A protein has these predicted regions:
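Q-loop/switch helix immediately C-terminal to the Walker
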Residues: 1-13
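A short, proline-enriched helix->beta-strand linker immediately N-terminal to the Walker B motif
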Residues: 67-71
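Conserved ABC ATPase signature
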Residues: 48-52, 56
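Conserved ABC ATPase "signature" region
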Residues: 12-15, 23-43, 152
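Short catalytic/signature loops enriched in Gly
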Residues: 135-218
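P-loop NTP-binding/switch modules centered on Walker-like glycine-rich loops
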Residues: 74-78, 82-162
Length: 218
C-alpha cells in the first residue's frame, strides 16, 4: 500500500459520514500537508514502505498518529533501531508537533538517556508495575527505588571507568507475580503484603519496600 493511502485510511475511518468522500485535490492537499509536517517531500506519497529508510518510516508513522490532531500521543519505542542522529531528528519532529497540537506524549522506552532528554515526568516500571514516579530531573538526580538506581547506574558515561554491575537473579514471572514487591525476588527476598506508595519529595513517589530499599546504593 502506498504511503498516501496509509495516511488517508485513518482519516476515512474517523469520518462522521462514511459516504463523504474527499476529492482528489483534497486528498493531495491533505497528504502533502501531513508529509510536510514531518519534513518529508510530497513525492513520498507515491512510495511504498520498503522504499523508505528507517527514519522516514518513523516520520510517516508520526504523520499518521497526528493526522487527527490527538490530545494524547502514545510513542512506544519511537527510535528503536535508529542511529543516534536519526533518533534526535525523529524526537525533535515529534516534540515540534506536540507543541503545535498542545498534546501530551506518553513515551515508552528502555533508553534512559532518551527518556532523560525528552521527558518532563518519568514512571519506572518493573514486572509490569510502576515502582517510582516523579519529575525526570529529580528521579535521575536522586533515584529512590533500587531498580531505578540500578538502571541509572548502568548508563555509560565518559567519566565512569568502572565495570558495569548487572542485576542478579531472574525477572519475576508475569503469570505468577507476588502480592508484595516483585523486585525482592531478584535479590532473594520475599514480601507477601502490598507495598505502599510513599511521597519522598515534591511530586516524587516510590513503592516503599523496606526489604530492598538499600539495594544498589553506593
Amino acid at each position: 500500500m502506498k504511503i498516501k493511502n496509509q495516511l488517508l485510511d485513518g482519516l476515512y475511518d474517523h469520518q462522521k459520514d462514511k459516504n463523504d468522500k474527499l476529492s482528489k485535490e483534497q486528498q493531495v492537499e491533505i497528504v502533502e500537508k501531513l508529509l510536510k509536517s514531518v519534513d518529508l517531500a510530497p513525492g513520498v506519497a507515491e512510495m511504498y514502505p520498503h522504499e523508505l529508510s528507517g527514519g522516514m518510516k518513523q516520520r510517516v508513522a508520526i504523520a499518521i498518529a497526528t493526522s487527527m490532531e490527538p490530545r494524547v500521543i502514545v510513542a512506544d519505542e519511537p527510535t528503536s533501531a535508529l542511529d543516534v542522529v536519526v533518533q534526535r531528528n525523529v524526537m525533535q519532529t515529534l516534540g515540534r508537533l506536540q507543541e503545535g497540537l498542545h498534546a501530551s506524549i506518553i513515551l515508552i522506552g528502555h533508553d534512559m538517556g532518551l527518556v532523560a532528554q525528552f521527558s518532563d515526568h518519568v514512571g519506572v516500571m518493573y514486572a509490569g508495575r510502576l515502582v517510582e514516579v516523579g519529575p525526570v530531573k529529580t528521579v535521575f538526580k536522586s533515584p529512590k527505588h533500587p531498580y531505578t538506581r540500578l538502571l541509572i547506574q548502568s548508563l555509560p558515561t565518559l567519566s565512569n571507568k568502572k565495570d558495569f554491575i548487572g542485576i542478579p537473579g531472574l525477572p519475576a514471572s508475569l503469570l505468577n507475580l507476588p502480592e508484595g514487591c516483585a523486585f525482592c525476588l531478584r535479590i532473594g527476598q520475599v514480601t507477601s503484603t502490598k507495598i505502599p506508595w510513599v511521597n519522598v519529595a515534591k511530586d516524587h513517589f516510590i513503592q516503599d519496600c523496606k526489604k530492598c530499599a538499600d539495594y544498589g546504593k553506593k
